[in-house]
Protein backbone atom coordinates (compact mmCIF):
# COMPACT_ATOMS: atom_id res chain seq x y z
CA UNK A 1 0.00 0.00 0.00
CA UNK A 2 2.77 2.40 0.94
CA UNK A 3 4.66 1.44 -2.20
CA UNK A 4 1.71 2.35 -4.41
CA UNK A 5 1.29 5.59 -2.60
CA UNK A 6 4.90 6.57 -3.08
CA UNK A 7 4.71 5.66 -6.73
CA UNK A 8 1.68 7.91 -7.21
CA UNK A 9 3.39 10.76 -5.44
CA UNK A 10 6.46 10.31 -7.62
CA UNK A 11 4.38 10.39 -10.74
CA UNK A 12 2.46 13.46 -9.68
CA UNK A 13 5.63 15.14 -8.32
CA UNK A 14 4.13 15.55 -4.95
CA UNK A 15 7.14 14.09 -2.99
CA UNK A 16 9.02 16.54 -0.76
CA UNK A 17 12.54 16.39 0.63
CA UNK A 18 13.13 15.01 4.04
CA UNK A 19 13.80 17.60 6.66
CA UNK A 20 17.05 15.86 7.76
CA UNK A 21 19.54 15.28 4.91
CA UNK A 22 23.39 14.66 5.19
CA UNK A 23 25.49 15.75 2.23
CA UNK A 24 29.29 14.82 2.11
CA UNK A 25 31.52 17.08 0.04
CA UNK A 26 34.25 14.95 -1.64
CA UNK A 27 37.73 16.34 -2.15
CA UNK A 28 38.72 17.03 -5.73
CA UNK A 29 40.95 14.56 -7.56
CA UNK A 30 43.67 17.15 -7.99
CA UNK A 31 44.40 17.09 -4.29
CA UNK A 32 44.77 13.31 -4.32
CA UNK A 33 47.19 13.44 -7.25
CA UNK A 34 49.16 16.22 -5.58
CA UNK A 35 49.50 14.17 -2.41
CA UNK A 36 50.64 11.17 -4.43
CA UNK A 37 53.11 13.32 -6.31
CA UNK A 38 54.34 14.77 -3.02
CA UNK A 39 54.96 11.29 -1.68
CA UNK A 40 56.76 10.31 -4.86
CA UNK A 41 59.03 13.34 -4.76
CA UNK A 42 59.79 12.82 -1.09
CA UNK A 43 60.70 9.21 -1.81
CA UNK A 44 62.90 9.69 -4.85
CA UNK A 45 63.87 13.35 -4.82
CA UNK A 46 64.24 14.13 -1.14
CA UNK A 47 67.39 16.13 -1.85
CA UNK A 48 65.28 18.61 -3.85
CA UNK A 49 63.29 19.47 -0.73
CA UNK A 50 59.98 20.08 -2.52
CA UNK A 51 57.32 21.16 -0.06
CA UNK A 52 53.50 21.14 -0.44
CA UNK A 53 53.59 24.90 -0.91
CA UNK A 54 55.84 24.35 -3.90
CA UNK A 55 53.37 21.86 -5.23
CA UNK A 56 50.54 24.35 -4.85
CA UNK A 57 52.66 26.79 -6.83
CA UNK A 58 53.21 24.11 -9.44
CA UNK A 59 49.49 23.43 -9.53
CA UNK A 60 48.93 26.85 -10.96
CA UNK A 61 51.01 25.71 -13.95
CA UNK A 62 48.89 22.88 -15.18
CA UNK A 63 51.42 21.77 -17.82
CA UNK A 64 54.15 21.00 -15.30
CA UNK A 65 51.80 19.11 -13.01
CA UNK A 66 50.29 17.18 -15.88
CA UNK A 67 53.73 16.11 -17.13
CA UNK A 68 54.84 15.13 -13.66
CA UNK A 69 51.70 13.08 -13.18
CA UNK A 70 52.32 11.33 -16.50
CA UNK A 71 55.88 10.48 -15.52
CA UNK A 72 54.88 9.11 -12.14
CA UNK A 73 53.42 5.69 -13.23
CA UNK A 74 56.16 5.18 -15.78
CA UNK A 75 58.84 5.86 -13.23
CA UNK A 76 57.34 3.41 -10.75
CA UNK A 77 56.98 0.76 -13.46
CA UNK A 78 60.65 1.09 -14.44
CA UNK A 79 61.62 0.95 -10.77
CA UNK A 80 59.75 -2.29 -10.17
CA UNK A 81 61.11 -3.79 -13.40
CA UNK A 82 64.69 -2.90 -12.56
CA UNK A 83 64.34 -4.28 -9.02
CA UNK A 84 62.92 -7.55 -10.36
CA UNK A 85 65.75 -7.96 -12.92
CA UNK A 86 68.44 -7.24 -10.33
CA UNK A 87 66.95 -9.87 -8.02
CA UNK A 88 66.74 -12.35 -10.92
CA UNK A 89 70.36 -11.81 -11.90
CA UNK A 90 71.56 -12.22 -8.33
CA UNK A 91 69.51 -15.37 -7.58
CA UNK A 92 70.42 -18.23 -9.90
CA UNK A 93 69.92 -16.77 -13.34
CA UNK A 94 69.91 -19.27 -16.20
CA UNK A 95 73.03 -19.02 -18.40
CA UNK A 96 71.15 -18.60 -21.67
CA UNK A 97 68.89 -15.85 -20.24
CA UNK A 98 71.57 -13.82 -18.49
CA UNK A 99 72.51 -11.66 -21.54
CA UNK A 100 68.88 -10.69 -22.20
CA UNK A 101 68.23 -9.95 -18.50
CA UNK A 102 71.35 -7.79 -18.29
CA UNK A 103 70.28 -5.81 -21.36
CA UNK A 104 66.78 -5.21 -19.99
CA UNK A 105 68.13 -4.21 -16.59
CA UNK A 106 70.52 -1.71 -18.15
CA UNK A 107 67.70 -0.35 -20.29
CA UNK A 108 65.49 0.20 -17.23
CA UNK A 109 68.33 1.95 -15.43
CA UNK A 110 68.92 4.23 -18.40
CA UNK A 111 65.20 5.12 -18.56
CA UNK A 112 65.17 5.90 -14.84
CA UNK A 113 68.19 8.15 -15.24
CA UNK A 114 66.52 9.98 -18.14
CA UNK A 115 63.30 10.41 -16.13
CA UNK A 116 65.26 11.81 -13.22
CA UNK A 117 66.68 14.48 -15.50
CA UNK A 118 63.25 15.28 -16.92
CA UNK A 119 61.64 15.61 -13.49
CA UNK A 120 64.45 17.80 -12.25
CA UNK A 121 64.16 20.14 -15.19
CA UNK A 122 60.37 20.27 -14.87
CA UNK A 123 60.59 21.17 -11.20
CA UNK A 124 63.29 23.77 -11.71
CA UNK A 125 61.38 25.22 -14.64
CA UNK A 126 64.18 25.02 -17.22
CA UNK A 127 62.46 22.42 -19.28
CA UNK A 128 59.08 22.38 -20.92
CA UNK A 129 57.49 19.45 -22.69
CA UNK A 130 54.92 20.12 -25.30
CA UNK A 131 51.80 18.04 -25.66
CA UNK A 132 53.09 16.62 -28.93
CA UNK A 133 56.09 15.01 -27.22
CA UNK A 134 54.65 11.87 -25.70
CA UNK A 135 56.33 9.47 -23.34
CA UNK A 136 55.95 6.66 -25.86
CA UNK A 137 58.25 8.51 -28.21
CA UNK A 138 60.75 8.95 -25.38
CA UNK A 139 60.63 5.25 -24.55
CA UNK A 140 61.00 4.33 -28.19
CA UNK A 141 64.03 6.56 -28.41
CA UNK A 142 65.72 4.96 -25.43
CA UNK A 143 64.82 1.44 -26.51
CA UNK A 144 66.15 2.18 -29.99
CA UNK A 145 69.35 3.51 -28.52
CA UNK A 146 69.76 0.41 -26.36
CA UNK A 147 69.03 -1.92 -29.28
CA UNK A 148 71.49 0.02 -31.42
CA UNK A 149 74.15 -0.28 -28.75
CA UNK A 150 73.55 -4.01 -28.46
CA UNK A 151 73.75 -4.46 -32.23
CA UNK A 152 76.91 -2.37 -32.42
CA UNK A 153 78.51 -4.44 -29.67
CA UNK A 154 77.47 -7.63 -31.44
CA UNK A 155 78.88 -6.44 -34.74
CA UNK A 156 82.12 -5.37 -33.07
CA UNK A 157 82.37 -8.81 -31.48
CA UNK A 158 81.93 -10.46 -34.87
CA UNK A 159 84.55 -8.16 -36.38
CA UNK A 160 87.01 -9.00 -33.62
CA UNK A 161 86.33 -12.70 -34.08
CA UNK A 162 86.85 -12.37 -37.83
CA UNK A 163 90.13 -10.54 -37.29
CA UNK A 164 91.35 -13.25 -34.93
CA UNK A 165 90.39 -16.03 -37.35
CA UNK A 166 91.97 -14.20 -40.28
CA UNK A 167 95.20 -13.62 -38.36
CA UNK A 168 95.31 -17.29 -37.37
CA UNK A 169 94.78 -18.42 -40.95
CA UNK A 170 97.45 -16.06 -42.25
CA UNK A 171 99.95 -17.24 -39.65
CA UNK A 172 99.18 -20.86 -40.44
CA UNK A 173 99.58 -20.21 -44.20
CA UNK A 174 102.90 -18.42 -43.65
CA UNK A 175 104.19 -21.24 -41.47
CA UNK A 176 103.21 -23.77 -44.14
CA UNK A 177 104.93 -21.87 -46.97
CA UNK A 178 108.12 -21.13 -45.03
CA UNK A 179 109.30 -24.73 -44.56
CA UNK A 180 112.75 -25.58 -43.06
CA UNK A 181 115.48 -26.13 -45.70
CA UNK A 182 116.10 -29.79 -46.50
CA UNK A 183 119.69 -31.05 -46.12
CA UNK A 184 121.59 -31.59 -49.41
CA UNK A 185 121.28 -35.10 -50.75
CA UNK A 186 124.49 -37.15 -51.01
CA UNK A 187 124.87 -39.41 -54.05
CA UNK A 188 126.83 -42.59 -53.44
CA UNK A 189 128.23 -44.69 -56.22
CA UNK A 190 130.78 -47.44 -56.66
CA UNK A 191 133.65 -45.14 -55.72
CA UNK A 192 131.91 -43.82 -52.55
CA UNK A 193 130.44 -40.43 -51.92
CA UNK A 194 130.77 -38.21 -54.96
CA UNK A 195 129.43 -34.76 -54.21
CA UNK A 196 126.53 -33.07 -52.43
CA UNK A 197 123.15 -32.45 -53.96
CA UNK A 198 124.06 -28.92 -55.00
CA UNK A 199 126.83 -30.12 -57.34
CA UNK A 200 125.27 -33.33 -58.58
CA UNK A 201 122.06 -31.68 -59.79
CA UNK A 202 121.53 -33.95 -62.72
CA UNK A 203 118.28 -32.62 -64.00
CA UNK A 204 117.29 -31.43 -67.39
CA UNK A 205 116.88 -27.70 -67.93
CA UNK A 206 114.15 -28.20 -70.47
CA UNK A 207 112.54 -31.38 -69.23
CA UNK A 208 108.99 -31.98 -70.33
CA UNK A 209 106.34 -33.64 -68.20
CA UNK A 210 105.35 -35.89 -71.12
CA UNK A 211 108.72 -37.66 -71.16
CA UNK A 212 108.03 -41.17 -69.92
CA UNK A 213 111.62 -42.39 -69.59
CA UNK A 214 115.09 -41.00 -69.23
CA UNK A 215 116.72 -39.47 -72.31
CA UNK A 216 120.13 -40.78 -71.23
CA UNK A 217 120.82 -44.33 -72.50
CA UNK A 218 121.68 -46.99 -69.98
CA UNK A 219 124.94 -48.03 -71.66
CA UNK A 220 126.57 -44.63 -72.03
CA UNK A 221 129.30 -43.16 -69.89
CA UNK A 222 126.95 -40.51 -68.49
CA UNK A 223 125.57 -41.18 -65.04
CA UNK A 224 121.81 -41.12 -64.72
CA UNK A 225 120.14 -38.86 -62.15
CA UNK A 226 118.59 -40.34 -59.01
CA UNK A 227 115.09 -39.99 -60.44
CA UNK A 228 113.89 -40.24 -64.01
CA UNK A 229 113.14 -37.19 -66.07
CA UNK A 230 109.44 -38.09 -66.05
CA UNK A 231 109.24 -36.90 -62.46
CA UNK A 232 110.92 -33.57 -63.20
CA UNK A 233 108.68 -30.70 -64.31
CA UNK A 234 110.87 -27.74 -63.46
CA UNK A 235 113.34 -25.69 -65.47
CA UNK A 236 115.00 -23.97 -62.54
CA UNK A 237 118.10 -26.20 -62.26
CA UNK A 238 120.89 -26.27 -64.83
CA UNK A 239 122.01 -29.44 -66.55
CA UNK A 240 125.00 -31.07 -64.88
CA UNK A 241 126.16 -34.43 -66.24
CA UNK A 242 129.01 -36.40 -64.72
CA UNK A 243 131.35 -38.43 -66.95
CA UNK A 244 132.43 -41.84 -65.76
CA UNK A 245 135.87 -42.58 -67.13
CA UNK A 246 135.58 -46.29 -66.49
CA UNK A 247 132.80 -46.66 -69.05
CA UNK A 248 134.74 -45.57 -72.14
CA UNK A 249 134.20 -47.42 -75.33
CA UNK A 250 136.84 -49.96 -76.20
CA UNK A 251 137.38 -50.54 -79.89
CA UNK A 252 139.36 -53.13 -81.76
CA UNK A 253 143.03 -53.82 -81.01
CA UNK A 254 144.26 -51.86 -83.98
CA UNK A 255 142.32 -48.75 -82.91
CA UNK A 256 143.27 -48.98 -79.24
CA UNK A 257 145.44 -46.14 -77.97
CA UNK A 258 147.58 -46.14 -74.86
CA UNK A 259 147.83 -42.72 -73.22
CA UNK A 260 149.92 -41.70 -70.27
CA UNK A 261 150.45 -38.35 -68.60
CA UNK A 262 153.88 -36.76 -69.07
CA UNK A 263 156.13 -36.72 -66.06
CA UNK A 264 159.70 -35.50 -65.62
CA UNK A 265 160.77 -38.75 -63.94
CA UNK A 266 162.15 -41.57 -66.11
CA UNK A 267 159.75 -44.25 -67.13
CA UNK A 268 160.04 -47.36 -65.00
CA UNK A 269 158.66 -50.75 -65.63
CA UNK A 270 155.59 -51.47 -63.54
CA UNK A 271 154.14 -54.81 -62.53
CA UNK A 272 151.50 -56.17 -64.85
CA UNK A 273 148.02 -54.85 -64.24
CA UNK A 274 145.00 -57.07 -64.17
CA UNK A 275 142.96 -56.81 -67.34
CA UNK A 276 140.06 -54.44 -67.09
CA UNK A 277 136.70 -56.13 -67.31
CA UNK A 278 134.96 -55.01 -70.41
CA UNK A 279 131.58 -53.36 -69.78
CA UNK A 280 128.72 -52.87 -72.26
CA UNK A 281 128.97 -49.64 -74.12
CA UNK A 282 126.37 -47.47 -75.86
CA UNK A 283 126.25 -45.85 -79.22
CA UNK A 284 126.27 -42.25 -77.98
CA UNK A 285 129.58 -42.46 -76.14
CA UNK A 286 132.05 -39.87 -77.44
CA UNK A 287 134.85 -40.67 -75.02
CA UNK A 288 137.43 -43.41 -74.90
CA UNK A 289 138.76 -45.27 -71.93
CA UNK A 290 142.22 -44.44 -70.67
CA UNK A 291 144.00 -47.58 -69.62
CA UNK A 292 146.67 -47.49 -67.02
CA UNK A 293 150.15 -47.34 -68.48
CA UNK A 294 151.90 -50.69 -68.24
CA UNK A 295 154.58 -52.48 -70.26
CA UNK A 296 153.29 -54.75 -73.01
CA UNK A 297 154.61 -58.20 -73.71
CA UNK A 298 154.46 -59.31 -77.35
CA UNK A 299 155.11 -62.72 -78.91
CA UNK A 300 157.38 -63.23 -81.96
CA UNK A 301 155.63 -62.98 -85.28
CA UNK A 302 156.00 -65.34 -88.28
CA UNK A 303 158.87 -63.29 -89.69
CA UNK A 304 160.69 -63.51 -86.38
CA UNK A 305 160.13 -67.27 -86.25
CA UNK A 306 161.76 -67.63 -89.70
CA UNK A 307 164.80 -65.71 -88.49
CA UNK A 308 165.01 -67.94 -85.41
CA UNK A 309 164.81 -71.07 -87.61
CA UNK A 310 167.71 -69.78 -89.72
CA UNK A 311 169.71 -69.07 -86.59
CA UNK A 312 169.12 -72.62 -85.33
CA UNK A 313 170.59 -74.10 -88.50
CA UNK A 314 173.58 -71.73 -88.37
CA UNK A 315 176.60 -73.34 -86.62
CA UNK A 316 177.91 -69.96 -85.39
CA UNK A 317 174.96 -69.21 -83.14
CA UNK A 318 174.88 -70.96 -79.71
CA UNK A 319 172.04 -73.38 -79.34
CA UNK A 320 170.99 -72.14 -75.89
CA UNK A 321 170.31 -68.64 -77.26
CA UNK A 322 168.17 -70.02 -80.05
CA UNK A 323 166.21 -72.64 -78.12
CA UNK A 324 165.29 -70.40 -75.17
CA UNK A 325 164.04 -67.15 -76.66
CA UNK A 326 162.94 -64.58 -74.12
CA UNK A 327 159.82 -62.49 -74.28
CA UNK A 328 160.49 -59.07 -75.64
CA UNK A 329 159.28 -56.26 -73.35
CA UNK A 330 158.44 -53.06 -75.16
CA UNK A 331 158.03 -49.99 -72.97
CA UNK A 332 154.93 -47.90 -73.66
CA UNK A 333 155.51 -44.88 -75.86
CA UNK A 334 155.65 -41.56 -74.04
CA UNK A 335 152.81 -39.77 -75.71
CA UNK A 336 151.80 -36.53 -73.99
CA UNK A 337 148.15 -35.93 -73.13
CA UNK A 338 147.03 -33.72 -75.95
CA UNK A 339 143.38 -33.17 -76.75
CA UNK A 340 140.57 -35.57 -76.04
CA UNK A 341 140.19 -39.24 -76.73
CA UNK A 342 138.41 -38.42 -79.99
CA UNK A 343 141.51 -36.56 -81.21
CA UNK A 344 143.78 -39.39 -80.11
CA UNK A 345 141.56 -41.92 -81.86
CA UNK A 346 143.50 -41.52 -85.09
CA UNK A 347 146.86 -42.46 -83.51
CA UNK A 348 147.69 -46.03 -84.51
CA UNK A 349 149.97 -48.37 -82.66
CA UNK A 350 153.01 -49.27 -84.73
CA UNK A 351 153.97 -52.90 -84.94
CA UNK A 352 157.58 -53.73 -84.07
CA UNK A 353 159.77 -54.66 -87.00
CA UNK A 354 162.31 -57.45 -87.20
CA UNK A 355 165.22 -54.99 -87.01
CA UNK A 356 163.81 -53.55 -83.79
CA UNK A 357 163.45 -57.02 -82.34
CA UNK A 358 167.00 -57.93 -83.23
CA UNK A 359 168.38 -54.72 -81.85
CA UNK A 360 166.50 -55.15 -78.61
CA UNK A 361 167.67 -58.74 -78.33
From Swiss-Prot:
Family (UniProt): Belongs to the herpesviridae UL51 family.
InterPro entries from the xrefs? Answer: Herpes_U44 (IPR007619)
Keywords attached to this entry: Host cytoplasm, Host Golgi apparatus, Lipoprotein, Palmitate, Phosphoprotein, Virion, Virion tegument
Per UniProt, subcellular location reads as: Virion tegument; Host cytoplasm; Host Golgi apparatus
**Compositional bias (Low complexity) spans?**
266-281
Identify one Pfam family in the record. Answer: Herpes_U44
Under the subunit heading, UniProt states:
Oligomerizes. Interacts with UL103; this interaction mediates UL103 incorporation to virions.
CC terms in the record's Gene Ontology section: host cell Golgi apparatus; host cell viral assembly compartment; viral tegument
Q: What is this protein called?
A: Tegument protein UL51 homolog
Q: Post-translation: what modifications?
A: Phosphorylated.
State the organism of origin. Answer: Human cytomegalovirus (strain Merlin) (HHV-5)
Amino acid sequence: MQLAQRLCELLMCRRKAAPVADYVLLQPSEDVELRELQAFLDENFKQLEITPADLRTFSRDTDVVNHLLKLLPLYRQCQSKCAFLKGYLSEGCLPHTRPAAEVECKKSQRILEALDILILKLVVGEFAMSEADSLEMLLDKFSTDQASLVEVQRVMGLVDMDCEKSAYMLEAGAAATVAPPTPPAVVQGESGVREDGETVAAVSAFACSSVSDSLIPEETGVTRPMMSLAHINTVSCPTVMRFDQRLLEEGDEEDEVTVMSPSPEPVQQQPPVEPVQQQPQGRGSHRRRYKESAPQETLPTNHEREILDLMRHSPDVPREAVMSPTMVTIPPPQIPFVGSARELRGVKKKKPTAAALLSSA
